[in-house]
Amino acid sequence: MKIIVTGFDPFGGEPINPALETIKSLPKTIAGAEIILVEIPTVFDKAADVLEEKMAEHLPDAVLCIGQAGGRVDLTPERIAINQDDARIPDNEGQQPIDRTIREDGQPAYFSTLPIKAMVEAIHRIGLPASVSNTAGTFVCNHLMYQALYLAEKQFPKTKAGFLHIPFLPEQVVDKPGLASMSLNDIVRGVEVAIGAIVEYRDKEDIKKGGGSTH
């Protein structure tokens, strides 16, 4: 089994991105699966171009995109990506699309095809906080998740795809009182077991366990 795992470069004035630091720390094999690590530019459209090239090169069984969600307290597999860019801040090339459709021939939204409930359960088992998220935002993270699922539908039908948001690292919140963080070691541990769940549930339906929200 081959799994592409992506991480974004720093953006929004941050000197580091925990997603990129995380993938740099991952082993090349997890639960018997070959892990293909890909750095992604935090740039609309270009992010998808890089991913599409790597998917065509490696024909992975799964794609797990990882991104920074500053302010979140836990590891959050995303349930859904929407067909809309609405950038509050510019990307790393100064683009700031507002209310733009990502793919004219794409679905209004795509659900993750990864076992998000099993991923959360696996992270909980090692004593780390995790929950299913129902919004990936409208910046480049949602953009890339949507593009990954679009590409899977249109070009790579055997590939499952999804997204995992992770908190800030401690060094990123030194001057941000009240914001949560998680150590790189814990994030990496959580990502590893989440990938293990992807491998375990490759040919199985995700577990049925309450993980929704009331608002």
Curated annotation (Swiss-Prot):
GO cellular component terms attached to this protein's record: cytosol
Pfam families associated with the record: Peptidase_C15
Coiled-coil parts of chain: none
Keyword field: Cytoplasm, Hydrolase, Protease, Thiol protease
Gene3D superfamilies: Peptidase C15, pyroglutamyl peptidase I-like
Substrates-to-products reaction catalysed: Release of an N-terminal pyroglutamyl group from a polypeptide, the second amino acid generally not being Pro
UniProt-listed SUPFAM superfamilies: Pyrrolidone carboxyl peptidase (pyroglutamate aminopeptidase)
Coarse class of the protein's main subcellular location: cytoplasm
Entry keyword Endoplasmic reticulum: no
Biological process annotations from GO: proteolysis
Superkingdom as given in the UniProt entry: Bacteria
Location in or out of the cell: Cytoplasm
Entry GO MF terms: pyroglutamyl-peptidase activity
EC annotation from Swiss-Prot or TrEMBL: 3.4.19.3
Function: Removes 5-oxoproline from various penultimate amino acid residues except L-proline.
Protein name in UniProt: Pyrrolidone-carboxylate peptidase
